[in-house]
């Protein structure tokens, strides 16, 4: 194709993504759009087609973004090329959302006609506005008995400030309103800007590792053209590769002769090393490079850290390779090697949030067959020492000696909780219990309230989300962003088994709750750790001070079984002998800590005030 034909083709391209809160019907809408445009034959169609990971389908959530090309013949008789970039809705995957939005010109905002706007809907809308996207509101699930489209239309205008007078009323499940959505995309979403004749600039928004073809890049072409046989170059590190294949996804990969400005597709170039590519990097041609890279993405900082250790220590290298491959596909995962006396060699990993951590652990166990032990998650604390230094510490075992600590700061988040009015009391009580500071409260409509709190991230990491859902019968929606570091009265609590510290069980706790928390864990461990041949004391300590203790009684053989009557001194002799043996065992014996013990530190049952 000559450059004029390419420019005409570019006029017909529409790149859009679908944004919504969890469960508002985003993946179902994507399915309907694929059916309507006949991208997927009815034989291949299955629910949540774009959620390709088993894990996504089981949990009913979207984790990875996906990019699909569709052809749609509009009412004006022209055929348009639509690129649908599917995005996750969960707060932990905001990074995935921001990456997909950067590759689009428009966004379809799906709002549930019964539930209305939720906290994550807002968060994603603001991301879309940051990227200057054309936003098309769609009110979904209008066939539900509880649907109230007019109220939701008003809500979109009041809360977000978008004109919702032309919002499409749709039901993705029943297939209502799908054509109107496609027509609006064609009419309202602008064609990609960009110059076909300029040097190639392609933004990598995702990548996957293929055992045969190496790393496959998913790109959005911003300027220029790329075709097989070209030599491409990464702008961040200057590495160059020969393109073997380019193409698009119609969920399946389909090879093409070229990818031109505005296209969303993949490039395979026999890239062997995972480390050579980075999501957010710019690809250009080696013989005609672009003068400067694209903006890319802002680097995401992990919020939650945890140690991952293989249960079989010989799987350490497998774990490293698995993490490298996952990192390729999930740019926000970070990891570095660490060792623990209790657990051996493993990695300290950084995640965006708890769901992200859960998903990574499950993917490692499923896709790479590695059995893992995971330590309690912690956040990054800033420690000001008496020497005037500031240390950033995410691992409790790296905490300096308490005598050298001047003050400790912990991250606070600004939490937005949207909740029906009747549950406001329960939410406020929960936030207060989690050391939250009340900021403000706005009424969205007669029934729904947006409550804003400043809460320490460490409190959210444990079980805030579960507690929030259960105390509001699942009606609350929640979104958070890091706001600042504040000084707090924090202490490090060590757990001692048989007098030895178990480094993997250490955790950071607020001084006020230290005693209760210590007591709770000691009692929990007592139930979980199997009885030994000798007595095992379990202690919780802050520095040198023991705050709680519980003993696991020894198992003992009945050495008096053979004595029928007889002198009491004979019995005493046997008991003393047994006692001496137990004492010797205790001196040299070590205690096996089962995996549940590490998990119990996580799921602190809050029978106490904490």
From Swiss-Prot:
Residues 11-193 form the tr-type G domain. It is found in: Cell membrane. GO terms for cellular component: plasma membrane. GTP binds at residues 23-28, 140-143. PROSITE patterns: G_TR_1, G_TR_2. It is a peripheral membrane protein. Gene3D superfamilies: 3.30.70.240, Elongation factor 4, C-terminal domain, Elongation Factor G (Translational Gtpase), domain 3, P-loop containing nucleotide triphosphate hydrolases, Translation factors. One of its GO terms (molecular function) is GTP binding. Its main location: membrane. GO terms for biological process: positive regulation of translation. It catalyses: GTP + H2O = GDP + phosphate + H(+). Keywords: Cell membrane, GTP-binding, Hydrolase, Membrane, Nucleotide-binding, Protein biosynthesis. Signal peptide: none annotated. Its EC number is 3.6.5.n1. Belongs to the TRAFAC class translation factor GTPase superfamily. Classic translation factor GTPase family. LepA subfamily. Required for accurate and efficient protein synthesis under certain stress conditions. May act as a fidelity factor of the translation reaction, by catalyzing a one-codon backward translocation of tRNAs on improperly translocated ribosomes. Back-translocation proceeds from a post-translocation (POST) complex to a pre-translocation (PRE) complex, thus giving elongation factor G a second chance to translocate the tRNAs correctly. Binds to ribosomes in a GTP-dependent manner. HAMAP family: LepA. This is Elongation factor 4. It comes from Streptococcus uberis (strain ATCC BAA-854 / 0140J).
């Amino acid at each position: 194709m000559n450059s004029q034909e390419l420019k005409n083709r570019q006029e017909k391209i529409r790149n859009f993504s679908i944004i919504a809160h969890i469960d508002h019907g985003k993946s179902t809408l994507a399915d309907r759009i694929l059916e309507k445009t006949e991208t997927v034959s009815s034989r291949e169609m299955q629910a949540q087609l774009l959620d390709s990971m088993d894990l996504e389908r089981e949990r009913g959530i979207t984790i990875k973004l996906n990019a699909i090309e569709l052809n749609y013949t509009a009412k004006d008789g022209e055929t348009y090329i639509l690129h649908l970039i599917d995005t996750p809705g969960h707060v932990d995957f905001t990074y995935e959302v921001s990456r997909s939005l950067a590759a689009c010109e428009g966004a379809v905002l799906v709002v549930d006609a019964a539930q209305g706007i939720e906290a994550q809907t807002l968060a994603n809308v603001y991301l879309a506005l940051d990227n200057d996207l054309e936003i098309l509101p769609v009110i979904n699930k209008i066939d539900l008995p509880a649907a109230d489209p007019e109220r939701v239309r008003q809500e979109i205008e009041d809360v977000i400030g978008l004109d919702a007078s032309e919002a499409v009323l749709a039901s993705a499940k029943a297939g209502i309103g799908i054509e109107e959505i496609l027509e609006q995309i064609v009419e309202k979403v602008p064609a990609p800007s960009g110059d076909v004749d300029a040097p190639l600039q392609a933004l990598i928004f995702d990548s996957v590792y293929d055992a045969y073809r190496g790393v496959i890049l998913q790109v959005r072409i911003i300027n220029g053209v790329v075709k097989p046989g070209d030599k491409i170059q990464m702008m961040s590190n200057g590495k160059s590769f020969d393109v073997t294949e380019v193409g698009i996804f119609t969920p399946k990969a389909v090879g093409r002769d070229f990818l031109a400005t505005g296209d969303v597709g993949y490039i395979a170039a026999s890239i062997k090393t995972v480390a050579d590519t980075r999501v957010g990097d710019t690809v250009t041609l080696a013989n005609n490079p672009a003068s400067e890279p694209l903006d890319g993405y802002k680097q995401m900082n992990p919020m939650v850290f945890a140690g991952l250790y293989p249960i079989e220590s010989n799987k350490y290298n497998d774990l490293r390779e698995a993490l490298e491959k996952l990192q390729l596909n999930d740019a926000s995962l970070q990891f570095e090697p660490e060792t623990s006396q209790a657990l051996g060699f493993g990695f300290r990993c950084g995640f965006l949030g708890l769901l992200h951590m859960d998903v990574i652990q499950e993917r490692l166990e499923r896709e790479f067959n590695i059995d893992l032990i995971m330590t309690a998650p912690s956040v990054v604390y800033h420690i000001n020492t008496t020497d005037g230094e500031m240390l950033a510490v995410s691992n409790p075992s790296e905490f300096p000696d308490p005598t050298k600590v001047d003050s400790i700061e912990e991250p606070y988040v600004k939490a937005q909780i949207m909740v029906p009015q009747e549950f406001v009391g329960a939410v406020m009580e929960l936030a207060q219990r989690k050391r939250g500071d009340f900021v403000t409260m706005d009424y969205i409509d007669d029934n729904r309230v947006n409550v804003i709190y400043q809460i320490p991230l460490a409190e959210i990491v444990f079980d805030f989300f579960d507690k929030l859902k259960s105390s509001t019968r699942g009606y609350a929606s929640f979104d958070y962003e890091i706001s600042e570091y504040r000084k707090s009265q924090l202490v490090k609590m060590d757990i001692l088994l048989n007098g030895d510290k178990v480094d993997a069980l250490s955790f950071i706790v607020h001084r006020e709750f230290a005693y209760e928390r210590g007591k709770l864990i000691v009692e929990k461990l007592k139930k979980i750790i199997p009885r030994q041949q000798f007595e095992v004391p379990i202690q919780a300590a802050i520095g040198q001070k023991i705050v709680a203790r519980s003993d696991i009684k020894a198992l003992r053989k009945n050495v008096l079984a053979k004595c029928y009557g007889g002198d009491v001194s004979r019995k005493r002799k046997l008991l003393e002998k047994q006692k001496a043996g137990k004492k010797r065992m205790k001196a040299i014996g070590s205690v096996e800590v089962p995996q549940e013990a590490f998990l119990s530190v996580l799921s602190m049952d809050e029978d106490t005030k904490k």
